[in-house]
């Protein structure tokens, strides 16, 4: 085998298995930092996983089932050292909406979402995510933060029999507010206050420096440990308090209850399910999930790619977006074999990972191992965790998702983008897919309007000059013809015109036909239309079209000088052999400009 072939094969293998790129350089220093980061993330993900299972409407163990597979898959396939895959608030909300509190539906949704994500990665379809704009994403996540947060008020206050639909939830929560359990309310609010205080301490902790006294370094390390593991600390403390009351025969808190012990069995996803003595087939399950088969994989990819790009930019490295699609897709497919529901990249846990100095995705191995150990040995203790404490964890986790700044920023910068933001935000309270679909449609209409009606710069005078400020595509050709016709041909008398094409990088057949008809209109009026600033690919295309009366000039001055010739002078059409020498040489270059 030729050396070049071996080199290409090795490069391709490293691209598909990024672990091969950094493992040869792995060091003991990296191992120490990765271990600390993995442990920190593990202490964060365990209480969050239990809490997010509640958001998803599933038994608590399903949160833990969903929390470890991504750690191992991303070790091999991930291109970001910071990202951690697992259950998130947004994904849990979507799962709740599309799986009807049925674990079988949730696991099948993970499998099908993973297949779709894998296909997108293999076919390099990641660019499709670019059509969901930032205002749409912000509108959805802001609405989701309110939906998720308010949905936990019932657990925070110990209320029972509250519906899950948002508007009914709001109504019944206020209707039954008098049934608040004092124990749950006190514990929940105290847990939330403690979490907020610890988070504030973490954010305002002074950076370390070599000249710190040993006692100060130790104190800082202790505070850093407590604030980083604040979720685990608060949930563990609440569980101890609840256990103390339980052994005395008092029951002031609503507890999580019995959790299935042990590791999840490895089995294929359920392609049918029996409910109320009726077997629901695979096709019926797919039909029941409906739009979720598009919304869940797309939102999972968006959330994960957004997290990866954010931390890659912050920490000065690059990610491979299509490789990230493969990583998250395979995570969901393999996760479905161990009863996981759909997962994605977690911003909060990724931030913990980055702040603790993680060096490689190997930190995920520690996190995954910690989750497996907790499943195997600690599930009996998790049953004493009060639901109000988990509600406090969720509410403090989703509060930052509500982005007030985006509303102010768009008002100052681009008010039109407030339209898709508000449409998505408001409709997401009604139906999630309607919010995302309507917001994306509004964004697309705004984009199409700018394509169909590009802004132009106009210079009036004896010769009319028009310059499109952006590209020229087929939806815009009629508007362009109308603008030139109204200003030049319908003037009294008709006057010649120049089309300045500096910003036009390509033209399609419809544009060529429209320009040909425009040239004929100018000839009928006895005036001329000249083209200036054509890029080489566009010039090639127009010359190949052999448009009658086509004239091209290098500069605007040349065009104006030509068009201002004495009446009766017949100008010569410019063909490829008459193009200025510099341009002609470019035309002959197969590589373009």
UniProtKB/Swiss-Prot annotation:
Biased composition (Polar residues): 582-593
Extracellular side: 1-34, 78-82, 128-176, 255-287, 346-361, 405-417
Known catalytic reactions: hydrogencarbonate(in) + chloride(out) = hydrogencarbonate(out) + chloride(in); sulfate(in) + H(+)(in) = sulfate(out) + H(+)(out); oxalate(in) + chloride(out) = oxalate(out) + chloride(in)
Region called Disordered, residue ranges: 564-593
Spans through the membrane: 35-55, 57-77, 83-100, 107-127, 177-197, 234-254, 288-308, 325-345, 362-382, 384-404, 418-438
GO CC aspect terms: apical plasma membrane; basolateral plasma membrane; endoplasmic reticulum; Golgi apparatus; lysosomal membrane; membrane; nucleoplasm; plasma membrane
Main location: membrane
One GO term of the biological process aspect: oxalate transport
Gene Ontology MF annotations: chloride channel activity; chloride:bicarbonate antiporter activity; monoatomic anion transmembrane transporter activity; secondary active sulfate transmembrane transporter activity
Disrupted gene: phenotype observed: Conditional knockout from Purkinje cells (PCs) induces a negative shift in the reversal potential of chloride as reflected in the GABAA-receptor evoked currents, indicating a decrease in intracellular chloride concentration. Both in vitro and in vivo, PCs show a significantly increased action potential firing frequency of simple spikes. At the behavioral level, mice show deficits in locomotor activity.
Entry comment describing in which tissues the protein is expressed: Abundantly expressed in the cerebellum, with a predominant expression in Purkinje cells (at protein level).
InterPro entries per record: S04_transporter_CS, SLC26A/SulP_dom, SLC26A/SulP_fam, STAS_dom, STAS_dom_sf
Role, per record: Sodium-independent anion exchanger mediating bicarbonate, chloride, sulfate and oxalate transport. Exhibits sodium-independent sulfate anion transporter activity that may cooperate with SLC26A2 to mediate DIDS-sensitive sulfate uptake into high endothelial venules endothelial cells (HEVEC). In the kidney, mediates chloride-bicarbonate exchange, facilitating V-ATPase-mediated acid secretion. May function as a chloride channel, playing an important role in moderating chloride homeostasis and neuronal activity in the cerebellum.
Protein name as annotated: Sodium-independent sulfate anion transporter
Organism: Mus musculus (Mouse)
Gene this protein is translated from: Slc26a11
């Amino acid at each position: 085998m030729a050396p070049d072939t071996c080199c290409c094969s090795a490069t391709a293998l490293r691209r598909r298995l990024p672990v091969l790129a950094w493992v040869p350089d792995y060091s003991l220093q990296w191992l120490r930092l990765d271990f600390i980061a993995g442990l920190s993330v593990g202490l964060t993900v365990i209480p969050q996983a239990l809490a997010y299972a509640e958001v998803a409407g599933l038994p608590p163990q399903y949160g833990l089932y969903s929390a470890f597979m991504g750690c191992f898959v991303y070790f091999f396939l991930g291109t970001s050292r910071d990202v951690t895959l697992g259950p998130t608030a947004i994904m849990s909300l979507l799962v709740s909406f599309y799986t009807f509190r049925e674990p079988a539906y949730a696991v099948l949704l993970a499998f099908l979402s993973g297949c779709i994500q894998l296909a997108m990665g293999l076919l390099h379809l990641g660019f499709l995510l670019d059509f969901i704009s930032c205002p749409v994403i912000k509108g959805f996540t802001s609405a989701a933060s309110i939906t998720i947060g308010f949905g936990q008020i019932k657990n925070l206050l110990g209320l029972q029999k509250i519906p899950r639909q948002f508007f009914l939830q709001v109504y019944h929560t206020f209707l039954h507010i008098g049934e608040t359990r004092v124990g749950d309310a006190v514990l929940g609010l105290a847990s939330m206050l403690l979490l907020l205080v610890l988070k504030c301490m973490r954010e305002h902790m002074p950076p370390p420096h070599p000249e710190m006294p040993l006692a100060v370094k130790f104190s800082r390390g202790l505070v850093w440990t407590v604030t980083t593991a604040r979720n685990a600390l608060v949930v563990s403390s609440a569980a101890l308090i609840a256990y103390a009351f339980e052994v005395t025969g008092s029951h002031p808190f609503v507890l999580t209850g019995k959790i299935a012990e042990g590791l999840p069995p490895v089995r294929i996803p359920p392609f049918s399910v029996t409910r109320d003595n009726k077997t629901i087939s695979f096709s019926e399950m797919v039909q029941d999930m409906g739009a979720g088969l598009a919304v869940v994989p797309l939102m999972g990819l968006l959330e994960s790619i957004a997290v990866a790009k954010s931390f890659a930019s912050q920490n000065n490295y690059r990610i491979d977006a299509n490789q990230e699609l493969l990583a998250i897709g395979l995570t969901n497919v393999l996760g479905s074999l161990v009863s996981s529901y759909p997962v994605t990249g977690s911003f909060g846990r990724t931030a913990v990972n980055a702040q603790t100095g993680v060096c490689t995705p190997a930190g995920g191995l520690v996190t995954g191992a910690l989750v497996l150990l907790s499943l195997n040995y600690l599930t009996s203790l998790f049953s004493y965790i009060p639901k109000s404490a988990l509600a406090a964890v969720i509410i403090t986790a989703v509060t930052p998702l509500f982005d007030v700044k985006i509303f102010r920023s768009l008002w100052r910068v681009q008010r039109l983008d407030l339209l898709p933001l508000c449409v998505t935000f408001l409709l997401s309270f009604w139906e999630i897919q309607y919010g995302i679909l309507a917001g994306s449609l509004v964004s697309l209409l705004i984009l199409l309007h700018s394509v169909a009606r590009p802004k132009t710069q106009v210079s009036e005078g004896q010769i009319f000059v028009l310059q499109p400020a952006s590209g020229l595509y087929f939806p815009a050709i009629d508007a362009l013809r109308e603008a030139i016709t109204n200003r030049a041909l319908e003037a009294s008398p008709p006057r010649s015109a120049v089309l300045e094409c500096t910003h036009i990088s390509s033209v399609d057949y419809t544009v060529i036909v429209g320009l040909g008809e425009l040239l004929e209109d100018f000839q009928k009026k006895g005036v001329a239309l000249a083209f200036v600033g054509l890029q080489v690919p566009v010039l090639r295309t127009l010359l190949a079209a052999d448009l009658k009366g086509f004239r091209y000039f290098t500069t605007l001055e040349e065009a104006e000088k030509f068009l201002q010739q004495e009446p009766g002078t017949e100008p010569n059409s410019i063909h490829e052999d008459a193009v200025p020498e510099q341009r002609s040489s470019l035309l002959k270059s197969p590589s373009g400009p």
